[in-house]
């Protein structure tokens, strides 16, 4: 099928690149799940950094951030532990190393993984002022509906202070939010898009 070649080709390309750089890397494979509308198997990579294993799924990252005019690279699946990756990946069907730490998760390394709502608000104010796109990961407990509503309110409030409306996209399973602001032309409802990674492998 057409969906199979995409992730397999990307995972093999990542392995070739990492092999060339001397980074240990294998290909992971999980099953399909017709009940969930996942009609193909999926492949990605497991890498080893300083003796610790992490999941790296370039296919899922490549499928995100295509809303609006923005096509910036995403890192939601860059060095995840088992707990995080299997929130939206099916179980493995071939043996692979356990990935038990998240220390090198991209957003954590870049200090873009927040546990306090005030940090989100502070960065939202900066984003509204500078007119940029901002992506962050939430790790202040589970991203429940109540927590999400609080974060969305703060992001919108920061925009209102600069007479701007927020455009927000959400990768809920990985607790990653991305937003920017547009000029406020009257009472426009803030736009929230729920992104689903790797839509190409679903029915």
Residue ranges and their predicted role:
Residues 3-7:
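Alpha-helix N-cap/helix-initiation motif
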Residues 1-2, 81-203:
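N-terminal accessory/pre-domain segments preceding catalytic cores
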Residues 8-82:
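Hydrophobic/aromatic-rich core segments of domains that either
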């Amino acid at each position: 099928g057409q969906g199979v070649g995409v992730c397999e080709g990307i995972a093999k390309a990542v392995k070739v690149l990492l092999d060339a750089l001397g980074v240990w890397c294998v290909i992971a494979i999980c099953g399909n799940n017709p009940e969930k509308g996942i009609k193909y198997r999926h492949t990605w990579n497991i890498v080893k950094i300083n003796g610790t294993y992490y999941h790296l799924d370039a296919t899922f990252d490549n499928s995100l951030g295509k809303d609006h005019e923005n096509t910036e690279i995403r890192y939601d699946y860059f060095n995840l532990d088992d707990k995080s990756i299997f929130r939206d990946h099916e179980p493995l069907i071939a043996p692979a190393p356990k990935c038990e730490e998240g220390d090198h998760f991209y957003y954590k390394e870049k200090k873009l993984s927040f546990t306090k709502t005030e940090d989100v608000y502070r960065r939202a104010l900066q984003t509204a002022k500078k007119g940029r796109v901002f992506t962050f990961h939430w790790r202040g407990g589970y991203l429940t509906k109540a927590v999400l509503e609080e974060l969305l309110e703060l992001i919108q409030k920061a925009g209102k202070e600069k007479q701007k409306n927020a455009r927000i996209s959400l990768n809920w399973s990985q607790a990653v939010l991305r937003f920017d602001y547009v000029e406020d032309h009257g009472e426009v409802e803030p736009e929230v898009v729920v992104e689903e990674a790797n839509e190409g492998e679903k029915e």
